[in-house]
């Protein structure tokens, strides 16, 4: 399973993603760490699509290894989100503007998300575990031949 936690810079993506990934036995993939590793700080539309693809490949590798991938990155456009191809999306809608004007201008509100965080609570990551668990249970009921991975066995 590939989970995308996205939103404007400063919205709490990493603050949610790291403890959430730990709680579910998943692998946290942080966009800033990935950009640093590849020394790619290009935030043009092309650079952002390259980052979405890079994040997708890393997350797909995690899933192929039998774990849940939890990726957090801005992913500002619907095209970038589709390129990443998540199984589950979490929109961190906790701020109206981030610290980068170019990102604010290009950020597209999603037409759909699986979980919408509009206010941060100290236990948001724990609440998300239960929501994802129910989602995975519904998926298992619809497709009983699929195997759940990580700590998220249902």
Per-region residue spans from a language model:
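The conserved Walker
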Residues: 8-9
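Small-molecule kinase domains that catalyze NTP-dependent phosphoryl transfer to phosphate-bearing small molecules
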Residues: 82-83, 92-154
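Short, structured coil segments at secondary-structure junctions
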Residues: 24, 85-87, 112
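Glycine-rich phosphate-binding loop used to anchor ATP phosphates in small-molecule kinases
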Residues: 45-100
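Conserved lysine of the Walker
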Residues: 13
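Walker A (P-loop) ATP-phosphate-binding motif of ABC ATPase nucleotide-binding domains
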Residues: 2
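Hydrophobic anchor at the beta1->P-loop junction of P-loop NTPases
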Residues: 5
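Conserved substrate/cofactor phosphate-moiety recognition/catalytic segment
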Residues: 17-58
């Amino acid at each position: 399973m590939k989970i995308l936690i996205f939103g404007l810079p400063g919205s709490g993506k990493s603050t949610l993603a790291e403890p959430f990934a730990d709680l579910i036995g998943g692998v946290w993939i942080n966009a800033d760490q990935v950009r640093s590793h590849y020394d790619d700080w290009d935030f043009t539309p092309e650079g952002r699509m390259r980052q979405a693809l890079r994040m997708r490949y890393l997350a797909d590798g995690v899933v192929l290894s039998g774990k849940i991938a939890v990726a957090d990155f801005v992913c500002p456009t619907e095209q970038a989100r589709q390129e990443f191809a998540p199984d589950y999306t979490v929109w961190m809608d906790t701020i109206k503007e981030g610290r980068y004007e170019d990102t604010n201008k290009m950020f597209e509100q999603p037409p759909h998300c699986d979980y919408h965080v509009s206010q941060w609570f100290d236990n948001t990551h724990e609440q998300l575990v239960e929501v994802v668990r129910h989602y995975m249970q519904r998926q298992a009921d619809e497709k009983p031949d699929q195997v759940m991975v990580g700590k998220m066995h249902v």
